[in-house]
Amino acid sequence: MTQTDRDAENGRDREKDREKEQQRGVKRPIMPAAVPEPVQEQIQANFIVVIHPGSRTLRLGRATDTLPISVPHVIARRHKHPGQSRYEDKCLLREGLNSADSNEQRQNGLKMVDQVIWSKKMSNGVRRTPVSAEQARLYNRQIRPAVLDPNSKVSWTNTSHHPEYVVGEEALYVNPTDCYSVHWPVCRGRLNLHSGSGGSLSAVMMDLEHIWTHALQKLLQIPLKDLKYYRCILLIPDIYNRQHVKEIVNMLLVKMGFSAVVVHQESVCATFGSGLSSACVVDVGDQKTSVCCVEDGVSHRSSRLCLAYGGSDVTRCFFWLMQRAGFPYRDCQLGNKLDCVLLQQLKESFCHLDQDISGLQDHEFRTRFPDSPVLLYQLRLGDEKLQAPMTLFYPAAFGIVGQRMTSLLHRSQGDAEDPHDEHFLLTTQSKQDQSSKASADRKSFPKPSSFEGESSVCEVSDRSSLGQDLDLGHSQAECLVGGAETEETPSALLSRKTAMSQFEGKALGIDKAILHSIDSCASDETKRKMYSCILVVGGGLLFHGAQEFLQHRILNKMPPSFRCMVESVDVITRPKDTDARVCVWKGGSVLACLDTTQELWIHQREWQRFGVRMLRERAAFVW
């Protein structure tokens, strides 16, 4: 056999071996699936839905809409079994009001409010005319309602066809005698989980899905089968529950069928909606108040603060004050949802924060309920209209005892679906810091030539100990996380721990919360920016005179060192002359049109494959 024949034979053998390997398959190292880079594509804004879920009101609309559609965030579900007990989430009542110390705390809080009212003069330099509740009560007790119309032309929601559920305004007007339970799925900015009927996570998520799909179909005229062509921008609180956000995103993408989702924070979107680059954002909602410092589209984590009170607490306090003044509508009950709607309207109509309005004034209001005549009431009030909104600055007057009223941002508890979370990063960073420090120490230590052998032994020992360090158990990992936290500057760590222990146990007034939030910023320049622009959004502080009142309190309480640095303290309560209640939603619609938003979209297939990891990779804030 010639050399040429042998080469040809060897070539055929190699080809056969290659075919056998292909048939058997070649073992390759298993690489973890990488999160894909966001795809740049042209998106039409009229196919983007912006959703802002509040505790009391759901606001949603297309990004091209001028204003959102507002719907009461409530659902009434038909009982599944005959004789099932009726359950109803309360609108104005809450835990902590029935404590033995509640009344005393409320009275002490109102005394502080009265002292502030009497201590401040009116703009003309004259002190306010003192008015006692007894003066108003003598008049109001004599009032009897006048019948304007025997038929109110308001009817209960028709449930004769036994719908499984009704939502929004219809849910408010379900007859209490019907076999329906009423649920508000969001409470104080979080999912309303409780031990009662309909309080499980799955039940609350079902309520959310039904309310939102109803609003999309009936109010935005978007068929559910077309949601695969739409995208969604979800606005969440600054201090959020990660598990709740994860469940809502899963509902939007998997159950409802949106093609993609962007999740962003309310405070940042508030600055977008008001056209500001930097501001201390104060969001006074119905059940919670959030304070956060935003700079160039970034929310400072250390400045986030959530107060567990809002406009509904002011409404309840206003009702107590009116009762003390002989409120003529004597059948009014805080447990009745229609009475709560009436009290909310009275608060918005009568209350103010204008020190120049003093003395007794006469008012009138109407009641219009199903199966009842339209009644006209006369009402005389004095300082009650000023006292009620001032409780936002003296929350002890709410009489809430035994509840955590202030929340700061806590470290993530981790998620089983996202192993490379904050805990992992902190642990890795700590180990890298320790390793680099040890290496630097070895390099800086002089090594005599006579001990070269020992030096090599020491290096081997160091490497082996480092390998053991990488195999730390769970408890050791927790220690490292804590150690990483202490690697922060001692002053920052001390101030954060002190703040948590000092403030979470008691209720802060809005002005004190603003001062604390700004003081948590890292630099004096950032603090100066925040003092210069305080943006108030939400519907809880929409009172006449609120802008001047808040500005006066901030100026009086801000640190003296900043008074010369800050040219003026601007408090903005009506950004661009728009309704402060829709400012956050407007910011979401602006976000939909930004070029940088292209990088934030989480697509349905990506979510199904990678899950909550996508929020960490794509969210515009630190997840």
From Swiss-Prot:
The keyword Protein biosynthesis does not apply. It holds the Pfam family Actin. SMART domains: ACTIN (SM00268). GO terms for biological process: cell division; DNA recombination; double-strand break repair; regulation of DNA-templated transcription. The keyword Cell division applies. One of its GO terms (cellular component) is Ino80 complex. It is found in: Nucleus; Chromosome. Residues 1-24 have a biased composition (Basic and acidic residues). Gene3D superfamilies: 3.30.420.40, Actin, Chain A, domain 4. Keywords: ATP-binding, Cell cycle, Cell division, Chromosome, DNA damage, DNA recombination, DNA repair, Mitosis, Nucleotide-binding, Nucleus, Transcription, Transcription regulation. Plays an important role in the functional organization of mitotic chromosomes. Exhibits low basal ATPase activity, and unable to polymerize. Proposed core component of the chromatin remodeling INO80 complex which is involved in transcriptional regulation, DNA replication and probably DNA repair. Required for the recruitment of INO80 (and probably the INO80 complex) to sites of DNA damage Strongly prefer nucleosomes and H3-H4 tetramers over H2A-H2B dimers, suggesting it may act as a nucleosome recognition module within the complex. This is Actin-related protein 8.
